[in-house]
Amino acid sequence: MKIVIQRVQSASVAIEDSTVGTIKQGLLLLVGVGPEDTKEDLDYAVRKIINMRIFSDEDGKMNLSVKDIGGQILSISQFTLFADTKKGNRPAFTGAAKPDMASQFYDDFNQSLSSYVPVERGRFGADMQVSLVNDGPVTVILDTKNR
């Protein structure tokens, strides 16, 4: 899994001009699923995201997690995180998981996250418009194959 984690003051996702998910303070996740991803990768990602201390405490130190602050998560599927740009000028996306596998994996990932904090989400495979107000900005890239 490749996940871009952004600390946000707010974020929303719309499909065909209709808002389908919105959060206040929390995390915006751009989630890519690879063909070799396993339940172990999913559990690792959830554990890291829920416990990642990237929110400021009363002293201004990044010492609190999304769970600690009572934050929310907006999760967006994004197979383009597996883009291969080595040849030519058009990225290849053959490194991403096939849609049927990736869709189920993405559902399981969001279900697992939602047992810890409220999760809003986009629609897998849809053309989405994502709006966000970055906080910091703080952006972290998590690759479950690089641990």
Curated annotation (Swiss-Prot):
Protein's job: An aminoacyl-tRNA editing enzyme that deacylates mischarged D-aminoacyl-tRNAs. Also deacylates mischarged glycyl-tRNA(Ala), protecting cells against glycine mischarging by AlaRS. Acts via tRNA-based rather than protein-based catalysis; rejects L-amino acids rather than detecting D-amino acids in the active site. By recycling D-aminoacyl-tRNA to D-amino acids and free tRNA molecules, this enzyme counteracts the toxicity associated with the formation of D-aminoacyl-tRNA entities in vivo and helps enforce protein L-homochirality.
Catalytic activity: glycyl-tRNA(Ala) + H2O = tRNA(Ala) + glycine + H(+); a D-aminoacyl-tRNA + H2O = a tRNA + a D-alpha-amino acid + H(+)
Record's subcellular location: Cytoplasm
One Pfam family from the record: Tyr_Deacylase
Protein known as: D-aminoacyl-tRNA deacylase
Subunit-level organization: Homodimer.
GO molecular function, one term: Ser(Gly)-tRNA(Ala) hydrolase activity
Family, per entry: Belongs to the DTD family.
Listed GO CC annotations: cytoplasm
